[in-house]
């Protein structure tokens, strides 16, 4: 019997997280000795629904992948079974990334057509990274943005309530749940319910109890007493299994009988704003934690209804970014070395609706009095206003410096979002943040467009 496979990626198979056409092209490039230096840009064309900005995330996983991106024996055996040539597989056995990477720091707010990552390397090496880079940066940026919007709501309309990711069980797979927990922390959450994210990334973990705990005992009182006897002052009780208000009163009675100061109670159903006020009246010294269907919209509605909460536990809406489930990032060739022309030459697509800006870029962010005013998208070698957001992170295959801590990244997000114009932060009808195209890049784009159109005539 063939053993079942859970579907884990390992360092030995990580390089196979690539669409087949990447390997098809690699084999062709090497067979034709077509290995010029090339540059690729990873960016998104449009903001997702109701988004005024995107929080860049996932760079650390990109860099971790580059650290160990090799074709192990298991990967090579599989590719041989798939019909790839022996000479090609021999070359893959010695694969390692030797190029350069520039990127915007995680936690930076970004806008359409601005590179989040730029890669310069021999064409086969840069090409191989497409699927993996898009997967890691696109998904985490989507979730970090969703989380940042929730954090912004509780900062602007609440009291800075605690936010905990409860969404791993509803995520689209184990890797999605794990990376969503990290991205939520990057976006400003305080922790996650997922232990694996605590172990892998150091994200603080939180947990209370499930309805099954309460239901497993003969009575609600016995379930509360058993929990309180086990966890004492650390106890947070789920009080809505049968009747929320009665559950709150019972929780108070059990705590007093046991001589315990309850840490808090959790509400997971019903008219949460109304019930939270009734619970707070009965348990004024206990934290009230609210879950069930939470996102930036329901949290804002809860707060505007004068609900009482010390924390929220968003789940499905967070880990799936339910209202805007796709960022659709792209990874496009923007420059390539051409024989006889000297150095990298800018390249672009002319497809309808998918025109790209050619060449490597700089993204200048112009600020005034600590607030972001506008960005300028320009050529990499072009002088321009504002600080360039793209920083070297890998040079000749080696990391340039140590990565920031997760807490430092989280602070970068907080600082970036607060620096945006208030209208851009609106969660339903955000204003447009201005991104200007430099004169040099505009001229380069028009020059290359004209040349390509003439070539096709």
Give a label for each model feature.
Residues 1-231, 333-457:
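Ordered alpha/beta subdomains of enzyme catalytic regions
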Residues 212-370:
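Glycine-rich phosphate/ribose-binding loops and adjacent secondary-structure elements
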